[in-house]
Structures are given as structure tokens and as C-alpha cells.
Amino acid sequence: MYLIKKLIGGAIGLTAAVGMATAVFAADISGAGATFPFPIYAKWASAYKGVSGNGLNYQSIGSGGGIKQIESKTVTFGASDMPLSVAELNRYGLLQFPTVIGGVVPVVNVRGVAPGAMTLDGATLADIYIGKISKWNDPTIKKLNPSVNLPDQVITTVHRSDGSGTTFIFTNYLSKVSPEWKSRVAFATAVDWPVGIGAKGNEGVAGNVAQTAGSIGFVEYAYAKQNNLAYTKMANRDGKVVSPVAAAFGAAAAGATWDPANGFGTLLTDQPGADTWPIAGATFVLVYKQPQDQAATREALKFFQWAYRTGDQMAAGLDYVPFPDAVKQRIIGSWTQVQGWNGS
């Protein structure tokens, strides 16, 4: 079993075997979906339990699963890194709002390559996942990394096998930087991968990369950091080489408007700016405007209200980017559309 380092000593940890589908933490508010925000939702949940006595049962099953579960009304809230369209939200009577911003990072298992030692760009990353670049000492990779000793080793690509918002962010980026990727594969929570092996969840991808020599995968940055995986730097839209740090993830949102009229559905991939990480995204929560269980939905919103007010430092500690106070107030203000929400 591949152990993901405990986020909170003696409290909530993440464990995953390769292919393991679900990570769960205990108790009273029910949610399901994206694995991208699971580390921060777990940390918030532990702290919130301590101050309120209320727990959170969140199934980290992927964005596709979260959307299905909220649509089937089996959980109080769904979670997705792919924002739903206004038409989709209206069809199901859902309200959507973002919680934090994070970064999707390529991670590699290449002999002698330390975290941050390798640089890739979007076109090269797309060609690796298409299968056009199949060895680590390919001239294209060597040109980006003249001082790195790259082995004559076959590249094994690892991707998500489940419906995944992380996949949506990653493939949306590749579609913007590679015309061939856009025409052959496109972007969605699940795509027909040209090459490679699949794994469930960010946890599963991290585990596969750690165990497979010569591999490359993509995970939310907290998973790379917690598992000591060798992440790459990226050349961004402005041609600048940037490291995956919170400031770079936040820079991707510099021009975002975060409009409640479209469910705050802003994409942050391939944004301009010298300091911008190119594969960034927000993660979203979905609740019903007219919930069957108003009390449960009210408790879920109280949890996120508490997180907005007191959880920024915890989010920053895991390299997520909290929203500015003005945006948080706009988000909380949108909750008046939820029947039974009384503001606290």
C-alpha cells in the first residue's frame, strides 16, 4: 500500500493503494467528488469538528462521481474541478461556487531528477501524452533541459482512469497549447488517452508514478508535495519558466472576474503573465437551490462559511490559494438563492 503522508498528526490522513477508488473522512455533512481539494477539505474538516462538533463525510471519488452523486441527490454537496455551465446548473436547480485555487503539476520518476530540476512546456507535454515523444532523452526534452542528464529510457505516461476535474484542467490546458491534442483528444473529465496507464484519483496517479520508473503523471500540487514526487517546472504562455508555487497559481487568477451569474465558472489554464503557472484551476461545490434536506444543506454552507473566514492559513499551508475577501463575500452572498439558508 502506498501511504500518503498524514496531513494532521493523529487526525485525518490519506492512504491509497494503486487503483483504490475512495478516500473518506468521518462524520455528519455528506459530500462527494473531486480529489483535487481533498487535502484541504480534510484539514478544514478536522479543525471544524474541533470547534463545532460537526463532522464531514467526504468521498474523494473524482469530479465525475461527485456530479453524478449530487444529481442523484445521494449527498448534500457535490464537488468538481470542472465548472458546470449555466444551462447544466439550471437543468438540475444547482448553485455552484468555488472554494480554493490550486495547480495541476506534472510529476516524474526519472533517475537522478529531483523536484524542480526538469522543465517542460505545453507542446512537449502534449507530445509526451500523445506518444510522439516516447523516451526521456528525446531531443525536444534535452533542448529544454541542457544541464540535466536524461536517460535513454522509455516514458510511461500515467493518467486518471476515473471522471476527473484534474483531467479536465490538464486536458483543457493541452487543448490550448497543442492543436494536435485539441483535434485528436480535446478536453473533458474523461478522454480517450492515446497512450499510458490509468489510475483512480490523484492518490492513484501519485502512487503509480512513485512506483514506476520512467513515468510521468499529473496531480494537484499538494499530492506531489506530500509524496515527495519530482514535479517539473513549466514554461508558461509568456515563455517564462515558473515553479509550481501558490503565488504562481494565484497569478493565473489575476484577471478573473468570478461572476455569480455564470456560477463563478472561470477557467484559469494558459493565462498570461510572467509569473503565472499555466495549469491552474479553481475547485467548485454544488448544492441544490431547493434542497430536500434544508438543514443538511445549511450545515454544509456553514462549514464552507467557516472555512472562508478561518481556513486561509490552512489552505496556504497546503499551497492552495484562498480567494480574496471581496470574492468570498460575493460567493456567500450568492447563497441567498438556497432555500433555508439564513446567513449563518
Q: Which residue stretches match the model-derived regions?
A:
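Flexible loop/hinge segments at secondary-structure junctions
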Residues: 25-344
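Bacterial N-terminal signal peptides that target proteins for export
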Residues: 1-12
